[in-house]
A protein has these predicted regions:
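Cytochrome P450
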Residues: 1-336
Length: 336
């Protein structure tokens, strides 16, 4: 039943592991996501970002989430995991169903979400067998050959790692790109500033990450009694980490922390170091360098080419207590 499935996920998901087990597993996959490994993908990412905008530029309108925001993160994660690009739409659908089982438009039931995760597990196991015979993906090789305490990674654990990288690696970045675009359209002066000053795009990306974090919250369990800032937290208590709260902290970001401002870095020089969108501590986001690079490249392509972008129709959101996702966001712009 559901209890057993939850337990299997907790046992196998690296985000739910404690030290020292967590670091042993994290090390296995870490090398595929180092700044150096990610940096080598830059030409590939730029070419695909250009192609994505090429596909919509002449039309003067698009559904920004599926046609633009979702494309590059999904393509990149499939490339890293050695999955053929032709399977991309299938993974877009599976990812939505697994991450948003609670949304009636996406999945009709929890069973449907479980079915999607089992399909991905079956796919991952077949991919593992194929990659053992015919290695093309460095990340998959690292996972398959990685050893934890002298034992090779099991196919089952590989499959759970695959799901985590797949969902974590495309859903969150798609959300950050969609929110970033929405914020720029709601602040046309700031958008125009970036058209005129493309060198400031990378700092604008940090403000996007701060202002609308992809993940809403994570939950942790206290392992011992602790007093923190006058609060008594008992062993076994659940502690919720709210990313939006910490990213809007006036002490860190100034009195206008509730305002979206791409110039914030001029007042808060260490903006990048202060934001907690990627978490903090030993569980910090493995894909941080990849997400930042994808966002920078996408906005460097979007901003000069999709001019006078405006919201056209309703922006709809996923029903989720976990991910702050825009489901659909139709926009118009000057045809190119």
């Amino acid at each position: 039943g559901q209890e057993e499935i939850n337990q299997i996920m907790l046992d196998n998901f690296i985000i739910a592991m404690d030290p020292p087990k967590h670091m042993k597993y994290r090390k296995v996959v870490r090398d595929a996501f180092t700044p150096k490994a990610v940096g080598e993908m830059e030409p590939w990412l730029r070419q695909h970002a250009k192609d994505i905008i090429d596909r919509v530029a002449a039309r003067g309108e698009c559904e920004f989430v599926e046609e633009v925001a979702a494309e590059l993160p999904l393509m990149a994660i499939l490339e890293i995991l050695g999955v053929p690009q032709k399977d991309r739409k299938q993974f877009f659908s599976w990812t939505n169903i697994m991450a948003f089982a609670d949304d009636p438009d996406i999945a009709t039931s929890l069973e449907e979400a479980q079915a999607a995760s089992f399909e991905v597990i079956a796919y991952a196991m077949a991919l593992a067998a194929e990659q053992r015979k015919n290695p093309t993906s460095t990340a998959v090789q690292a996972l398959l050959n990685g050893e934890v305490e002298g034992e090779k990674m099991s196919e089952e654990l590989f499959a759970w790692m695959f799901i985590l990288i797949m969902v974590g690696g495309n859903e969150s970045t798609r959300t950050a790109i969609a929110h970033g675009m929405r914020l720029l359209m709601e602040n046309p002066k700031q958008l125009q500033y970036l058209v005129d000053h493309p060198e400031d795009i990378s700092q604008a990306v940090e403000e996007m990450l701060r202002y609308n974090t992809a993940f809403i919250a994570m939950r942790r369990t206290a392992t011992q009694d602790v007093e923190w800032n006058g609060h008594n937290i008992k062993k076994g208590d659940k502690v919720i980490l709210h990313y939006h709260a910490v990213n809007h902290d006036e002490d860190a970001f100034g009195d206008d922390a509730m305002v979206f401002d791409i110039h914030r870095h001029k007042r808060i020089p260490n903006l990048r170091g202060e934001i907690r969108s990627f978490g903090v501590g030993e569980h910090f986001c493995l894909g941080m360098s990849l997400a930042r690079l994808e966002m920078n490249i996408m906005f460097e392509e979007i901003i000069p080419r999709l001019r006078n972008a405006k919201l056209a129709g309703d922006t709809t959101y996923m029903r989720s207590y976990f991910i702050n996702t825009i489901k659909a966001m139709p926009i118009t712009f000057d045809p190119q």
